[in-house]
Amino acid sequence: MAALKYWVWLTTLPGLTNRSKLLLLEHFPSPEDIYYAQPEDLPPVEGLSSSQAALLSDKSTDRAEDVLARCAKGDIFLLTMQDALYPDRLRNIYDPPVLLYGRGRMPLFDEEAAVSVVGTRTCTPYGISAAEELGYQLAKEGAVVVSGLAKGIDLSLIHISEPTRRVVIS
C-alpha cells in the first residue's frame, strides 16, 4: 500500500500530463524514486519542461491519501503499470494510463472482451441514457467496460458496475 501512495501522488499532481509522467518513469524505477528525487537529481528529460519538473517539488501526499481512502471505501481497485495484471492491450499503446482505477470483479483484461467508451462532455439526456443502456447490456453479456470517466458520456457509465457486477475501468 505504501508504494501505491506514490503512484497516486504522481498521477494526481496538478499540471503534469500523462505523457510527462511516462517520461519520468522512463528515467526513474518507480514513482517513489521520483518523489524522493531532489531537483538536482532530475535528469534533463526530453519533453518535460522546467515548469513541469518544478511541479515535482509538491511533496504533499494528502491528495493521494484521500484518493486511497475513497478507493478503499468504494471498493475500487488500482493497477499500476508495473502490476502483472495491468493489461498488455493498454501497456503497448502510445500513451498508456499510468494508473487504472477499477470497480467490480478484477477481470483477466487480455482474455476478455472489452469495450471502450468515448463521448462528448456535453451530452443530451437521451445520449446519457443510450450510453448507460448500451454499457449495461455489454457488461451484462460479459464485456469489460473501459471509460476515462470524463464529464459527460464517459462518467455516466460508472453506475453500471454495481448492477452488472462487472468491472468499469478508468
Predicted regions and their residues:
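Short, positively charged patches
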Residues: 1-136, 140
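Residue-level detector of anion-binding/catalytic polar loops
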Residues: 77, 144, 166
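Short, glycine/serine-rich, charged loops/turns that create anion-binding
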Residues: 122, 150, 167
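Phosphate/pyrophosphate-binding betaalpha-module
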Residues: 135, 139, 143-161
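Single conserved hydrophobic/aromatic residue that forms the stacking wall/gate
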Residues: 158-170
